[in-house]
């Protein structure tokens, strides 16, 4: 009887401590936030958008980055094009990513890094123009507009 009582007390104590687990608190307000940047490149007009979802604990739970462009009066997004965007061979030729990676695959690396780090403090540029990321492997795309769009979304989340 004594062993059963001690086991019960230990079990209640364990559940009590588990319920007191500290909840990670982020620095952002709960909600979905949007940022965008417009620019022109190679004769096409682009709008880069970033959507950032922050949960009730203030933590970044998801990031979605895409780039819409209009060329020859046709609008589409880079994520919609998937492999048809045709960046894999270019990134392979740069030599940083074995076998290369499409645009959407590279931007997913950036999205995941933002969720992991919960901020953009990790961003380091490898060029004076601040277009090439030096702080994340698997990315050869010019990333300045993507980071700027996320910055705008996170600014709204503060």
Enumerate the language-model features and the residues they cover:
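Positively charged n-region of N-terminal signal peptides that target proteins for export
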Residues: 1-4
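Active-site- and interface-proximal helix/loop "cap" or "latch" segments in soluble metabolic
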Residues: 23-158
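C-terminal motif of bacterial Sec signal peptides marking the signal peptidase cleavage site
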Residues: 16-19
């Amino acid at each position: 009887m004594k062993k059963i009582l001690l086991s019960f007390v230990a079990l209640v104590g364990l559940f009590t401590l588990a319920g007191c687990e500290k909840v990670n608190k982020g620095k952002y307000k709960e909600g979905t936030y949007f940022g965008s940047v417009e620019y022109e490149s190679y004769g096409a007009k682009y709008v880069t958008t970033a959507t950032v979802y922050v949960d009730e604990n203030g933590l970044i739970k998801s990031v979605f980055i895409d780039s819409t462009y209009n060329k020859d009066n046709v609008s589409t997004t880079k994520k919609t094009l998937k492999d048809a965007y045709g960046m894999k061979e270019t990134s392979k030729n740069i030599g940083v990513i074995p076998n290369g990676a499409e645009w959407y695959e590279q931007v997913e690396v950036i999205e995941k890094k933002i969720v992991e780090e919960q901020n953009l403090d990790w961003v380091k540029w490898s060029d004076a123009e601040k277009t090439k990321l030096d702080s994340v492997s698997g990315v050869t795309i010019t990333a300045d507009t993507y980071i700027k769009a996320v910055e705008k979304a996170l600014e709204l989340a503060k």
